[in-house]
Amino acid sequence: MSFQCVKKYEDSYDKYVLAATSEKVVLPDYLDKESKKIAETIIKKNKFTAKASEKISMTLVNKKKVIEFIIIGLGEKKKLDAKNTRQYLFDGLKNIIGKVLFSFDNKDLDNIDILAEVVEHINYKFDKYFSKKKEEFLEVSYLTDKKVPKLIEGYELAKISNIVKDLVNEQAEVLNPKELADRATKLGKKFGFDVEILDEKKAQKLGMNAYLSVARAAHHRPYVIVMRYKGNAKSKYTFGLVGKGLTYDTGGLSLKPTDSMLTMRCDMGGAATMIGAMCSVAKMKLKKNVTCVVAACENSIGPNAYRPGDILTAMNGKTIEVTNTDAEGRLTLADALTYIVRKEKVNEVIDAATLTGAIMVALGEDVTGVFTNDEKMARKVIDASENWNEYFWQMPMFDLYKKNLKSSYADMQNTGVRWGGSTNAAKFLEEFIDDTKWVHLDIAGTAWASGANPYYSQKGATGQVFRTVYSYIKDNKN
């Protein structure tokens, strides 16, 4: 176990860590008088003031035992919030390994959830395919007299974040649509939600032709994954979640360049996000009803691949001219959204998708784009992101963007003009939600880290966004 809470000091730890604010460093009671005196001298000599992300290490003889004592700075107490507390704890702990006794110098900072999350985040590594694996980890025992809840939300969600990251980091040769469906089924059994798998024949009967056209050339066949959590039998309100589930995307006949294909294992990041949200809702036993749909498939090339110029009839009866086979995600989402609205009859929908490169041009790698037909709902989703180290920004959804989707041969086309690409994609999706309240999250930047982000510093899957979705559902009065 990488994290636990303890109530008393022991001398068996490899390191002893104190997180302190810059107002005044208050040394822990477990240090004896002589150790405190020496520590105070070292602090003064090194002009250590516990500024944000500042760190000092010293060797002390405490109660006749040699210990390594480390103080990490959190900066000014009044400036601390959930986001920067995470960052400063991460900065202070990320290079520490072994068994650690951790404490805050101020009980007002006593935050089990954030600390547990950071520890699990530091320890994560997708090393499945390395011949030599990471053997040393950070194991934190948190010294607190606070009553510890049976389920520490931050810790449980951090472990689920690892599941999300594993799904996204897994190579596409392994994580094909069938494997994704199987893993969702196993997670349903583990966490406590029902899973129904619709094969290609069932999807055909439902008229999910836009989705199935994308999957046509792939060796691995498509599967629709339907997950249902019933946490409140008395409520008639159901939250709907949809995740883009492209387990690999070549771009189809509108073939991607090689460099763009290298990270396309992450094109099912939306699916992983929503599976993570389902696991979280079930694990924390929220008294809510939630249904999630993932239309999983691969976008490949082959003799029967769908083509630019093809006209498809979606599940809701609308016709679509294909102008670019690399704008496939919105085609799969179109039918998934129709399915969850018309068949599952949810009251509102949030979808998450690694949908457009345009959102990264607009917002960079670290911000999720938010699109909606309901301002109040979007505001609540954005507010929920403030609970986590995540950044959301609402994008425009003016009706004038609809002109960019006009086709000479069908009701609409799947791509518009180059400009405003992320909103064009969102306006396309809006055609498939009927009158249901809806928020679309474009996570093309935030699902995958290049290594430049100070918190998501490990290249690969970030495990972001599912926590925001979870918090939104948890805090919602419906």
UniProtKB/Swiss-Prot annotation:
It is found in: Cytoplasm. Keywords: Aminopeptidase, Cytoplasm, Hydrolase, Manganese, Metal-binding, Protease. One of its GO terms (cellular component) is cytoplasm. The active site is at K256, R330. It comes from the Bacteria. Its cofactor is Mn(2+). The keyword Cytoplasm applies. GO terms for molecular function: manganese ion binding; metalloaminopeptidase activity; peptidase activity. The keyword Magnesium does not apply. Binds 2 manganese ions per subunit. One of its GO terms (biological process) is proteolysis. Mn(2+) 2 binds at K244, D249, D267, E328. Pfam families: Peptidase_M17, Peptidase_M17_N. Mn(2+) 1 binds at D249, D326, E328. Its EC number is 3.4.11.1, 3.4.11.10. Presumably involved in the processing and regular turnover of intracellular proteins. Catalyzes the removal of unsubstituted N-terminal amino acids from various peptides. Belongs to the peptidase M17 family. This is Probable cytosol aminopeptidase. It comes from Fusobacterium nucleatum subsp. nucleatum (strain ATCC 25586 / DSM 15643 / BCRC 10681 / CIP 101130 / JCM 8532 / KCTC 2640 / LMG 13131 / VPI 4355).
